[in-house]
């Protein structure tokens, strides 16, 4: 019977005790010597039974040489027990909860039965156990004292008598603890406390503490430093008596006590890092050992950090040989090729097994050897199982079948190409090598359009290249990692590659209708020349004579007809911004391709550019595959570049110069801006700037200046009037999307304008309000605050240049500081989501725990989507009926069809209007991403038909309607299988919802009125194609969607954080782009959030269209504390007098007059008799009171209600201009008395505390609402005619701060439309499902247009809320979601602490996910390894055919 094999299903962690060490140890260390002569000393710490790292001797245990021996542990029998340094806290817990006399528990175990196992002992030990009586032996439990100076020493305080607990005594105490007690306190039998005190410690194998000896005998030697620690440990152990007996309370000799302490310290240093470098001869506590100039190494020190065993050796990628060099561009290479220097090709070797079919091909390599390229370096002989150097072979050496030849790399080999950081899976791609024969070349070369995969450029970037060795790995690499697989981005669902820069401009120049010289035409020979380097089948030019002229559109059409598609879209070239200043040819303002022929328009970035979703290459990829799309990119690139080389294209300084008239006009515009800025300065100096609610005068002034100094759109007019768009290279680059933007063009030609850093102008950094030393003190002109009047072409002055450099310096610092944070955030996301894998039901689960019932809620792969428009969404009821209701045949079926279309439209509107109401910036649109573009399929079918328009009859129309209806009904069975479809088993609701959007589109595009000219056979073909594409768009089984989500979110989020400065210049973010993402992914509570907001809709429809009323409501909910209304305050110590004429402080003598008036006007508010000598005098800010609409009466009423132990007097509200409103608050004696009615010795502190309470008193508003402003919203509503109308006159309240519950209590706020950006606040009020949706919307809001596909956001949200609580992507969140996956948590961070906790809890770690199998040395079950393959080796052996037998059969 043959023995089978099995995979490791789980790993259990336990505390290793004496028995475990003795069972694993192969020998006992008794002496500290290393060698005796030339061999290891027997019984020494380098005993040959523990392994070998020396080629002079073998391992005695396994009889292997140093390369094959894995090492074997030994043991050191201690003369006195030692505590386990990793579990000191656990030892203390046990000492607190068990009787030191009998080992019985002194706590009631039933009190902790309801707790989970790991919490029981911790909770029991945290209670009061001192002085308790043991239930068994009735002994009083003493107080356990942890020595504050010595980490390893415990003391017991028994009724004033203090004794030291030596490890031997602790071991005896723990030996009395029963297994039943251990289990009831939540620990495993394998984690008995007796194992926490060791009599035998393990000595690690030789292989992990190697030594080097050069020569034999007295030659130079070098051994690992940890051997010195072990030597010290053995020597100190020998100094202690063998049979040392210690009795509790007994005094032992001082030298023995010191030796015991030193041994414990040495064992600690052996396992863990030293915290200090003090010598072991003096001091106490955690003392360290110094080896030379550095602390001694430890075993656990090898685990953490990037250079540790876990991240570097176990999780890190390792290859035998790799090459690295700088990259440069080469447009002659295909996108899937890489140019490889010949010097590299002769260094890297490829192992290839000699077979009958390749021996003739390999023979030249064998004969060339190392002398000539291509050659080889060595041969592995199968018969002798030995490796031979090619230069040392004998004359009669033969290359035979089965040998392995290590040959040079040649053109056509596949290789991995990688650029770090590898933020996406496309960062590692497989290319075909093209060996560069020129020996002077030493850089890697690649097509410029291939840079997008690696986010690379040619400014000195370096990349790695390595060649897979085996045939299996080469085939696997090409199938799984070929760059064609990365053509469609998982992140954005659009194409990654396309034309860039030169080829984009070339495509435009080739396809435009006219040139400055006239028609854009060429003769036959020139057209043929363009195709020379495209490496495609050349088009037929036989029908053209040498004198015939071809335009660029015809030439491009010859190429596009090889992959016929249909395309129609406005090009980037046409812009409404440029239309007033230039003449557009009517044939160039709309690009249209019909069945592969470019009818009109030009090819620019929107059609052929990199990342153009819905562009030409995207359509080709969807219909013909990504490989064909890559070929078309290369071919188009060659056409464009060849044309540019012939026709010429350049950018010169002449393209950047303005005419004198245009320059004068630009200066007039700049002077207008400066004049407006000066007027704002004058308003500031005269005090005429009145800031709105929520802004200070300075902030509002800066905001006015920024708005005033922005270049208006009309500055483009002089630029456009001074250039010729048909010949200006700079403008053509910008207009076609090849490079640059309008602001770049303005900065180069007209002026740079205001420099901003963090949404602010340059602020004064020097004394006396100076931004730079070039400007006078307290200068207010715009130039002193970073406004640059000159353009780059005109040149900058010294201060202007410095302002520009300040902006660049801020970018550099911001990037440097953010890189580490974003890198760690990316790593946390990868580890947090890596266990999420798609199973056979297209569910996403972590091992067996469900995360998503269906991946992405629709089961679709983000790479298999297209953008389409739903025609019915924006139509009114009447428009829908006119366009989609078929009235040619009177049948209830068509009434049913129209009713279904109307219900689909209303359902779509309902869903996305709800999303619009609960998202700050996501408006309803009729454009969505779906897996199948039905309209394109219908158009392609009709264009490929040769029968023309056929007459239609009633029977065929009804049959087609029935076909579509049945197809839509059965579409969800795509998620199940054909058997269930034939049986018509019930479809789960979530699968019906998954296909609902696709069914809506099918019913729209295949409505009866749109398919009258389609035959039943064509309809059948259309439905088959839809089903095929829909099935191919489903996510694959075993896909690691968690990692895909982490990569797709982390990469653009990293870019977002690095670009936060640029975003803030445009007013898009706060001062730091990293704050909000950290708040979202860290699941911070409400009180810890810095940037929370609320959007509040008003309940009354009439009020929400009136800005004034909305502002009044905003004022009423904004939290106003008394401190915000005060100009200044004073705490006075004075004696109150009824005559009011002896006010202590002369500066406030004028208060006597209004105080007298107050008493006369308020006869019922006379001062009480118990007024104290403390008075708080406050001056109110009348401006703030007016802006906040707060009356003095409301302030006084609020203060009297909140502070009854005071007497309040105030001046009148309507004071003259310049005279403040004054409030005097006299404290009463009752405020200074305790419950004993005795006066406090000092009352100054009480008075100061009263001031703090007073200033923080709430006058009005909702707690948590720091600021409230009125904003204008744009929302959609359905009118009575069913028309989707856009309303842009709605006012809502946007708050800084959040309090959903408080806002719901306000009668003016609509409680059903309250939106808060706070995930925690949403969770508290609405529950976990609302929090999940809030995570999605907040990530989308933060990342904006650069955000990834929403399926990745769903992955984040579902994982963070899977447990019923919002968990973070930090270490704590991973512990909550996957508490049993010890190996994963250990790989993330703090491996020593994680392993210690796992051993204490006896954790069982199931092997699943990616990190855990990798650490165990197995292959994770993902991708193609997700499915098990069963192979009948016996059948294969019996039916094996040799080459000769196959030839005979042939």
Curated annotation (Swiss-Prot):
Pfam family, one: RNA_pol_Rpb1_3
Sorted UniProt keywords: DNA-directed RNA polymerase, Nucleotidyltransferase, Transcription, Transferase, Viral transcription, Virion
Enzyme class: transferase
Catalytic activity, EC: 2.7.7.6
Upregulating conditions: Expressed in the late phase of the viral replicative cycle.
Quaternary data: Part of the viral DNA-directed RNA polymerase that consists of 8 polII-like subunits (RPB1, RPB2, RPB3, RPB5, RPB6, RPB7, RPB9, RPB10), a capping enzyme and a termination factor.
Protein name: DNA-directed RNA polymerase RPB1 homolog
